[in-house]
Amino acid sequence: MSSVLKEKYNKEVITAMRERFGYSNIMAVPRIQKVVVNTGTGRLVRDKGNDEEVVKYLTAITGQKPIACAARKSIASFKTRLGQIIGYKATIRGERMYDFLTRFITASVPRMRDFRGFDEKAVDAGGNFTMGIREHIIFPETISEDVRMIFGLEVTVVSNAKTREEALVLYRLMGFPLKKM
C-alpha cells in the first residue's frame, strides 16, 4: 500500500520538476531522503519517569522507537554530566517516512496554534527543511486525557536537492505549507 504523498511525488512532482528544471533523467529529480524527529529533554529528565513518557510519545508519533542521545561532555551551567541522556531522536525512511509526512502535513500542522505557514528561511542551502514544534500534542497519536507534560520537537526533512531553489519548489509541490516571501 503506497502512501498518498509518495503517489503524489511519483505522479505529479517528478513531471513538474522535470519541466521546470529540465532534468533529462528521472533519477536527477530531487527527492526526500529521510525525516529526523528529535527532542531535547533538558529539565524534563530531572523528574524520574518523564523519560519513559517522552519515549512513549515519540514512538507513537514516529512509529518507531527513538534512540537516546547522551551528553558528550559535562557542562556545569546546564547541569549535565558526561553520558547523561539529554534527548531522543528517530530517523524515519522509506514508506514510514511518507506516512509520517502525510499525517504531519494533513493532520498535525493545521492543529498548530496561530499557524500561518512555515518560513522559507527554514530551508537551508543544502535543501534541508527544519521546523520547530512547541507542543507535541498537535499530533493525533498523542491525544489522551493523561498528558502529564508537554515538550517540543524538531522535525528535519532531508532532501538531496542541489540548491535551495530546487528544494523550495520540491516542498511546495509536495504540499508543505510555506509562506509566500
Language model regions located:
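Ribosome-associated RNA-binding proteins
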Residues: 1-181
